[in-house]
Amino acid sequence: MSENRPEPVAAETSAATTARHSQADAGAHDAVRRGRHELPADHPRSKVGPLRRTRLTEILRGGRSRLVFGTLAILLCLVLGVAIVTQVRQTDSGDSLETARPADLLVLLDSLRQREATLNAEVIDLQNTLNALQASGNTDQAALESAQARLAALSILVGAVGATGPGVMITIDDPGPGVAPEVMIDVINELRAAGAEAIQINDAHRSVRVGVDTWVVGVPGSLTVDTKVLSPPYSILAIGDPPTLAAAMNIPGGAQDGVKRVGGRMVVQQADRVDVTALRQPKQHQYAQPVK
């Protein structure tokens, strides 16, 4: 007789299945207990394909590009700002006397007075030397001429004698009035820098010879130059190379522009002959003595 075996196989299969489920549950329980989450061993795993460029990636890349261009723009603005500040500082360098402290101005004035004292002492020394040469009957004509030329040059420089020669005649009208002391100082300094050898400032009634220690104070419409009060219009005579002196007045941002900025008007005329007749009186010096 044959026996029917399917029932035990089914039982065995059911038992195996039950065992596998028990192991899986135990493994999952153990994974949860250990803090790991894993798929069952018989669970199919999905394949990870290549990453695609998303809209977020494009936005991030666009943001980086904008950041680079923004940084370059900021750097360009900084460079332009530095250049502008440098230019402004160079343009305003002529106005340093306006912002100088009174103590600094006193030191500057004292140094100019010492310079004038030295020049006056040298003039006196040369005059004494010339007198000694003439008194001794020295026939060295070259030495006499050299001493006389040096004495004449220094005498003109300190304003002890008059002078004549080519130069410029400057007229400053100030209807405002607006020409302040620093504007007049700028005109004097520009002429000196251009090689003016003798300068004289006039108004309708007074004349002042500009020296190495000349100072200007006051208010627009009433300028005090070396203790003399002058009123507009002002006339300035300067001896030197006429084209050079005229060009110095017309430098952009220079003396003529400074007069225009405050409402004044400057006219510069070149001349073959300019006569500077005002003199400066030598000052008695208490401390400075000529060096032998």
From Swiss-Prot:
Q: Which UniProt keywords apply?
A: Cell membrane, Membrane, Signal, Transmembrane, Transmembrane helix
> What main location does UniProt list?
membrane
Q: Where are the transmembrane segments?
A: 68-88, 152-172, 229-249
Name the segments for region: Disordered: 1-30
Chain segments annotated as coiled-coil in the UniProt record: none
Q: How does it sit in the membrane?
A: Multi-pass membrane protein
- The yes or no answer to whether the keyword Cell membrane is present is yes
Compartments where found: Cell membrane
Gene Ontology cellular-component terms listed? plasma membrane
Query: Which branch of life, at top level?
Result: Bacteria
Q: Where is the signal peptide?
A: 1-28
Family from the record: Belongs to the UPF0749 family.
Record protein name field:
UPF0749 protein Rv1825
